[in-house]
Amino acid sequence: MNINNYSITLILLIKSNLVSSCMKIINSVVVVGLYYGFFTTFSIGPSYFFLLRARVLEVGDEKEISATTIGFIAGQLMMFISIYYAPLHLALRKPHTITALVLPYLLFHFFWNNHKNFFDSVYTTGNSMRNLNIQCIFLNSLIFQLFNHFILPSSTLARLINIYMFRYNNKMLFVASSFVGWLVGHIFFMKWVELVLFWIRQNHLIRSNKYLVSELKNSMSRIFSILLFIVCIYYLGRMPSPLVTKKLKKTSKREERGKNKEETDVEIEKISEEKGTNEQQEGSAEEDPSLCSEEKEGLDKIDETEEIQVNLNGREKTKDEFNKEKYSKNSPVCENYDLDGNQDNFELKKKEKEKKNIFWFEKPLVTLLFDYKRWNRPLRYIKNDFFENAVRNEMSQYFFYTCQSDGKQKISFTYLPSLSTFLEMIQQKMLLCITEKRSYEESYNNWVYTNDEKKKNLSNELFNRIAVLDKGFLVTDVLEKRTRLCNYENEQECLPKIYDPLLNGPYRGTIKELYSRSSMNEYLIPSIEDPRDTIWINKLYDIFPTDFKELKKKKIGKRINEIKKKVFQWSYKLIDDLEEEEEEEETTEDRGIRSRKAKRVVIFNDNETTKNNASNRDQVDEVALISYSQQSDFRRDIIKGSMRAQRRKTVTWKLFQTRVHSPLFLDRIDKIFVLSFDIDRILNFIFRNWMVEVTEFKIMDSEEQKAKKKDKKKKENERITIAETWDTVLFAQTIRGCILVIQSILRKLIVLPSLIIAKNIGHMLVFKPTEWHEDFEELNKEIHVKCTYNGVQLSENEFPKNWLTDGIQIKILFPFCLKSRHRSKLQPEDSLKKKGKKQNFYFLTVWGMEAELPFGSPRKGPSFFETIWKQLKKKHKKVKVKSFVAVKIIKERTKWFGKVSNEKTKWVTKKVQFIKKIMKELTKRNSISLFELKKVSESNSNRNKTEKFSIISNKMIPEFAIRIRSIDWTNYSLTEKKMKDMADRINTIRNQIEKITKDKKSIFLTTTTDRNIRPNKTSWDDKRLEQSKIFWQIVKRGRAKIIRKCNFFFHFCIEKICIDIFLSIINIPSRNIQILFQQKKKINDKYSYNDETKKNPIHFISTIKRSIYKTTNTSNKSQILCDLSFLSQAYVFYKLSQIQVSNKYNLKSLFQYHGTIPFIKDKIKIFFGTQGIFNSESRHKNFHDFGMNEWQSWLMGNDQYQYNLSQTCWSGLVPQKWRNRINKNLANSSNFYFYEKEPLIHYEKEKNYAVNSLPSRREKLKNYKYDLLSNKYINYENNSSSSFYGLPLEVNQAHAILYNYNTYNSEVFDLSGDIDFRNYLREDYDIDRDQNSDRKYLDWRTFNFCLRKKRNIAEWTNIDIGTSTTITKKIKSQIHYYQIIDKLEKNKTDNKGFLNLAIYKQIDSANQTKVFFDWMGMNEEILNWSILNRELWFFPEFLLLYDAYKIQPWIIPLNLLLLKLNINEKQKGDLHISYNKNKSLDLENRNQEETQQPVRGDLGSYVQKENNPGSDPLKKQTDGKEDFDRSNIQRNINKKKSKSNIAAELDFFLKKYFLFQLRWDNSFSEKIINNIKIYCLLLRLKNPKEIAISSIQRDEMSMDVMLVPKATTFIKLRKRRLLLIEPARLSINWDGLFIMYQTLVILQVHNSKYQTCKKKINVDNKGLIESMARHEILFRNRDKNNYDFLIPENLLSSRRRRELRIQICLNLRNFKVGDRNREFSNENSTRSCDLFFYEDKNLDVDIKKILKFKFFLWPNYRLEDLACMNRYWFDTNNGSRFSMSRIHMYPY
């Protein structure tokens, strides 16, 4: 086995090493370079033309091919080198390089190749390559390779360069490997080209067509010239000519200065958003993120820039047109700012250096030819708010710079640009100073040394303060105070915190500048006692100038040095169309920016004349909107004179194409059904016929709706396309407008009147009445209204402004329709209602037709002839009806005659056929004489008289004829003999057959003879036949009845079978439960001892159905019999949980610890010794008595602050506000006394054992005995309550053991009554409600308020489990008794009601004491009970749990099941909630009563009647708390007396828990949304839906006002599910609240699973006790020897405390100077923060100092400090990236 294990581990190691090595190889520089170089092969440039031309045409000349290839490779090598070498990169990537070099070279090469016959129509086939020498070929390939790629340009690859160059240190290796990768790809490409050429040469079709080959060879030079010409045009499009560009007007200096005065000061240094304060600026300015330079060559190419001048006096001034100044506001004034004292000499040296520059002419020449300030590149115009002119878009978000951090030189990607600029200026001016550079080791050691010194100083200071505290000094004298800025020492009038410069953190704020005299008087001179002093003050203001803005900046800033930085900026001020329209003054300047194509749509015109001044013309007020074009805008925000950006990613193939997109998004567009692979649609199409008819109709309806939507969308797109097409074509709007006007005139004056005339003339010809008046009256109703291009109507006579250029629409109101006949005016109302509303307007089209929408498809109007055709159809129908009878009679007569004639013809044909047949037979046979026939018959008749009739019947009729022809006597004898023989033979055969049949039918012949003899009498056979007939008739009738009733019969049988099966299943538990109870009783009797306490497990809900018959309660101890057939499964699980089995393994983990045995009592030692758990030797050893240490208790069990709060309240605390309050209380307190030992606050520790699944329950049952034993000795010295702080140094008297399955008490909704924390809870406190967190909250998702009336709703929020049990000294055994009481309404109770049975309940009619057992409030009166028949359920008791399950689906801690409340409802309806104490009974008394109980129903617990209610020994101790809780609950209930129970219940929850939201149904929303909109319009509010919900929630908006019935209330709306209560799906605030909560959760990790035994260590806590003496005054009723402990590090200030923690956590000596990258460092070598806790498990046993140090180190790992370290060290402030598990010891 060991060999196999070793082999498996070896294989795993080899595999892991292979995987890691493969990952390293893949991420290496060489592999990435090869990958990048291989993909650059697909980027094809113009040099490939020369390469392919040489391969195709110059097959024989190897030198020229090699020269082309070498030049091609050399050019690509230069491109790769330019990646690494910056000067070459700048030379090749200058903006004018391609314009100055590439275009002339391409044009020269193009014309030079074709100079001989460029204008000829026929090109020569001579090889132009032979005219060039090898050098020219090499240069062509080299130079063309440097040009930009135009096929598959490598923009993505260029971005990859920047990524990998920043990632890897060995850049040259990356360049070399990328070149090798490109070379490999190039070789593959050339091989592929050779294979293609070889295939072309070997192809028989091409070789056979010699003419095609010759033409191809002759035209190769022409093809090459054309391609080269296309490349030239392509580059000309990319880079326009620098000389022919549109010049723009520059802004004047006066405008610049005037506008600069209006600009506000720019604060460049960013303010920290977390603290919200302005930190001190260090004389440097941080530029806007958009001002960071992306390309450093921009500093050299731009001469006209703006200079940001950071002066130290705090104001901004304008130097000239291109220079601006920025100042840091809070920096002190420094007049003599000279770093090296030789600034003048530095300026002289700089000028001399510029004179020595040889290429001084380069900059003016480039500026002259290529003016970068012209808008000749497709750049966006980006306007900056800080500057009036636009800043070039050449900035980056990050700024990289090297800095020294942690004693090492590092690269920071968020370095302040202002600091780097300032540092560069200092380095330039410090020419004389020579600084020595230290090595990395030396600088790092120096940094470590300084940090060690800081740590030692802080540690010594802390130890000194602790030593002073131990000597007995007060805490106020030892604590480090904050330094404040005060006026006088005695008065101690300090500045406000917001203005105090010595404070930091949240106290700091911005100081507002004072400008007016009133504000200066208010701040500088807050109170003036003598009013005469104000006069002198005013005089002082008049003498001295106070308006500092008017002072000239030159006088102030003469001796102030400036920090300047060049900023890319344009010298033009450009505006677009919108800005031009917004300008109040008319500007003569042209718009410089091309705006998006739009139109001004006038919505409203108001023509009003001014009555006051008649000379003024009409004032036209227009309300207009801007309508943008639907087509793609390729010139938006582009400066006039610049070229369009080439959109390589979008494809347009239509004149007008909506939603232009890239081919990458083809999957988003609508697909064709044939080409798409939509599985749902295909399956729907295939299996459509297999569906049910109803679903088929639904599918058809949905498909029809989809088809309609699709058609509507298609028509809308077509309409927009037509509109945009008209708007795109030049002069199209003018032509269209004129055509529309002409069509309107023709329609109104010519077309329609001519139609009316023609119609009436036709009526006259047909002798019908004419309708001249009606037609012309309808024609006059038609109105043609002029509209804008978008269909906004203006008036009938007014044309829209600029309608010839913008377009026009003509709207026809009440359009005329020519009718053949006008109907009468008096029409019935029903016919008018059936018609419905008809659209009374249309838009005129270009073709004179009508459309419903502008540019819509023309409609099909009612036709004139259609009505005539309908009338003709009606007349035709009338004629048909009249002639229908005659036609019917004629048809019937013709049918009858046809039938008769057919019958006659058939009869005649039959007769004819019969005669013909007879004739044929006569001709065939010879006739026989009558004599012969007679003779034969006589001879035959003599044989047998009985056969007479058969012979005669069988004679042949055709032979009865007489022969006419002559007889041949010679042959006649032979034929006659033969005939006679045949006749004899036939007769014999017939006779035999007749005999056989005669024998068979003899019986029937006799019956017939009898009948003939007795015809009046019926025989027996006839009677039997009649009886059988009657029987079968009866059978048929019964069969019909059975067929009718079989369906009901089958149903009856099935129900009978199902009922039998269900009854048998239900009776299974009743047959088996007795066995379980007997076994349980045996086990309990076996393990019960008089000196041992029995367990008190948690009872599951066990509701048993009451027997149907009534039980009479004659005495107090009468029993209620129960029917065990309705036993719940939960009760079975409960009884199984009580089975006691001694398992040593469960206690193994507890007793492995060597310090366990001294804590165990002698009785328990003896018991476990008999079980073999303990060794007998260790039982009698006496060890030193250990106790629980206060510090250790506080460290291991307590949360951060010692207050009685739940985790919900802790998560809602504001940390800073809390700490300030606590520190203030500590600092201001001066009375410290300590007389009694009692806890600071009774804190009830929480531990949530959630019963969420069956395995979890089994695990709890498995560790049941272990938890019981450990709980006994954890709380060995504790009182009745399980307060964690009740762990004294002295040993109290031993009490009985209480085990409530958990070792603590908990509250469902922890509303702390000890301290009011409402001031410390944030209002916007929210948590993520979708997750099932550890915090207990009310789940509103499935809460059904209408399901039941909750009497104990107030107590749900304050369930107290701690007082649910009581203990006495005499009791050695204790048990809880629970019952469930669900009372139905009196009018609803009957024999079928489900009443929960109290197990072994003893009812005291006079004074009844009950112990309740409640699961999330099931002891309630159920109002809305379902109508279902619950007899068919297996376990009807589970129906009672259904609603409780919906509220909290089996995720409830077990300790929440106990609810000790007794609710008594008075007749007046007032609720009185009282507590019932658990009655502890002696084991002997219980055993005595146990003998008196019947055997049946031995299921649970007893409740003993107690005559004396005050017999409980601990009742007096709990009276105070009970009264307090009862008064609070009663106070909350009394407030709601005026409301109903449900309303009071809802208000109670809404006041305390606001973490929910209301949501209404769509139907309900539609009803009231109109009313809400009216309110919103009146109140000028937004978001009507949110306002409605919040208003309803705060009762600000009454539901009676809405469009719903007045009787509708909030409860009814919830019942009808119109208003739904949902959990508030809010996001988590990643702030101090979350950090505080996470801190508390992390601290509970070691205590959440199991409690371990505690030890006593004697520690001197004299000073600590004295410092905490003041708290005993606040809490006197607590247990003794419970303390609150001061954290030693709190003696220091918060800043010093954080500094000390960081110094401790740094562990500087373990640092490595090398690389910190995770991929190259060993992660196992880093030590995590938990080494202080887990490195040695026996630290708390050895010495006191280690324990003190461990307690002292505990706060160092709080999450809030680590968050600060994460923010400032790792430069990430996003909370989502912060994880406690990923933070290790620094460095990270």
Swiss-Prot record:
Domain of life: Eukaryota
Pfam families in the cross-refs: Ycf1
CC annotations in GO: chloroplast inner membrane
GO BP terms: protein transport
Matching InterPro entries: TIC214 (IPR008896)
Subcellular localization(s) per the UniProt record: Plastid, Chloroplast inner membrane
Membrane-related topology note: Multi-pass membrane protein
Bilayer-spanning residue ranges: 25-45, 70-90, 95-115, 132-152, 180-200, 223-243
Skewed-composition ranges (Basic and acidic residues): 253-277, 1513-1526
Region of interest (Disordered), residue spans: 248-297, 1482-1526
Location, primary (coarse class): plastid
Keyword annotations of the record: Chloroplast, Membrane, Plastid, Plastid inner membrane, Protein transport, Transmembrane, Transmembrane helix, Transport
Keyword Chloroplast among record annotations: yes
Subunit structure: Part of the Tic complex.
Role, per record: Involved in protein precursor import into chloroplasts. May be part of an intermediate translocation complex acting as a protein-conducting channel at the inner envelope.
Family, per entry: Belongs to the TIC214 family.
Name the UniProt record assigns to this protein: Protein TIC 214
Origin species: Ranunculus macranthus (Large buttercup)
Gene name of the encoded protein: TIC214
